[in-house]
């Protein structure tokens, strides 16, 4: 008896997962995340150099970050730009150096382009959440400016804190000697989960539950790590872009990776936004009343519907009886001799 109950619970669990995946697939088709990811990838490439320039300028404003700027750059390029990170780093640093020599108007233009990227991300995520209320211009600009100014500082502070913890003598013992390499190896994964979690909870202009955002963040971080390894393997083992484009191979490689990254980010957002919809639907309907395709079973006649049909038929019978009763005297009169 207990095994039957456990088997039924497992079946209900898998059926619920299957129904959620069907709902998620429908959402992905409706929202066209491939088109949104292409738009965000295009805006990202336009905003990449201005964003890096603004970020490095913010880090340079704090003396504590001057000594670890190279470490921050190496960490970002190695973990977020697989395979082509070294080449991209050389080009971006050169572009940033040229951009920093510009006038005040040019620097202001860089800030505007960087804000355009954050605005595009904001609009895409709020469209996924079906948000109807829009932020005011003042609130939106304040949020964008906070991301540009405080974002690099928080990233730098977290890396400084991590470097400090790793350098402590507390972790030099034999018991913890194997813990630190494992922690450092998992550090990019933890940063990815934290970044996605913050993105899914803060950017949408509505309340997002922590556990829903955490689920989307974990899935997105896992896919991001797998995507890095898979893309790096593809670029190194199948160098078709280098054979076709030669020295310009970095451009399409960077664009493809940015596009895949945004696909992963939007997929995590779709999972986070679909969870409350699915749970609300499940709370209002019985999971056993639908088939595996997510379609409701054929509705059967309910007792409540039968009285309506009976009353309708009764009214028709009464009308027919009245008509016959009205014509009956006439016919009887005509039949008299």
Swiss-Prot record:
Protein's UniProt keywords contain Iron-sulfur: no
Compositional bias of kind Polar residues:
307-319, 328-337
Q: List the InterPro entries hit by this protein, alphabetically.
A: UPF0761_bac (IPR023679), Virul_fac_BrkB (IPR017039)
* Residue ranges of the region described as Disordered: 291-337
- What's its membrane topology? Multi-pass membrane protein
Q: Which UniProt keywords apply?
A: Cell inner membrane, Cell membrane, Membrane, Transmembrane, Transmembrane helix
Its GO CC terms are: plasma membrane
Q: Which residues cross the membrane?
A: 4-24, 45-65, 102-122, 137-157, 183-203, 213-233, 247-267
At the top level of its lineage, which domain of life is listed?
Bacteria
- Tell me where in or outside the cell this protein is found: Cell inner membrane
Coiled-coil stretches = none
**Keyword Cell inner membrane among record annotations:** yes
Record PANTHER family: INNER MEMBRANE PROTEIN YHJD (PTHR30213), UPF0761 MEMBRANE PROTEIN YIHY (PTHR30213:SF0)
Describe the family membership recorded for this protein in Swiss-Prot or TrEMBL: Belongs to the UPF0761 family.
Name-wise, this protein is UPF0761 membrane protein Shewmr7_3708
Q: Which organism is it from?
A: Shewanella sp. (strain MR-7)
Top-down, what is the taxonomic lineage of the species of origin? Bacteria, Pseudomonadati, Pseudomonadota, Gammaproteobacteria, Alteromonadales
């Amino acid at each position: 008896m207990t095994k039957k109950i456990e088997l039924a619970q497992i079946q209900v669990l898998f059926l619920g997962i299957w129904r959620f995946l069907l709902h998620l697939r429908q959402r992905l088709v409706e929202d066209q995340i491939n088109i949104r990811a292409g738009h965000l990838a295009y805006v990202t490439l336009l905003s990449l150099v201005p964003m890096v320039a603004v970020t490095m300028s913010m880090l340079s404003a704090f003396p504590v970050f001057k000594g670890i700027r190279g470490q921050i750059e190496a960490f970002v390029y190695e973990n977020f730009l697989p395979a082509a990170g070294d080449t991209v780093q050389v080009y971006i640093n050169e572009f940033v150096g040229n951009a920093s020599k510009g006038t005040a108007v040019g620097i202001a233009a860089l800030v505007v382009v960087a804000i355009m990227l954050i605005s595009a991300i904001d609009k895409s995520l709020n469209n996924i959440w079906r948000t109807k209320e829009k932020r005011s211009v003042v609130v939106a600009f304040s949020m964008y400016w906070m991301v540009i100014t405080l974002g690099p500082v928080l990233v730098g502070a977290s890396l400084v804190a991590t470097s400090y913890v790793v350098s402590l003598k507390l972790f030099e013992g034999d018991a913890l000697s194997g813990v630190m390499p494992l922690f450092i190896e998992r550090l990019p994964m933890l940063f990815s989960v934290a970044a996605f979690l913050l993105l899914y909870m803060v950017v949408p202009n509505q309340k997002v539950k922590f556990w829903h955002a955490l689920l989307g963040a974990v899935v997105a971080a896992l896919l991001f790590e797998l995507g890095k390894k898979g893309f790096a393997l593809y670029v190194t083992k199948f160098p078709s872009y280098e054979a076709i484009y030669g020295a310009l191979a970095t451009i399409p490689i960077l664009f493809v990776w940015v596009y895949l990254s945004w696909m992963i980010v939007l997929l995590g957002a779709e999972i986070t936004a679909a969870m409350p919809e699915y749970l609300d639907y499940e709370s209002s309907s019985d999971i056993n009343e639908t088939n595996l395709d997510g379609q409701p079973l054929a509705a059967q006649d309910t007792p409540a519907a039968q009285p309506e049909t009976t009353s309708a038929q009764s009214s028709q019978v009464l009308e027919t009886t009245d008509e016959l009763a009205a014509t009956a005297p006439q016919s009887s009169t005509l039949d008299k001799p």
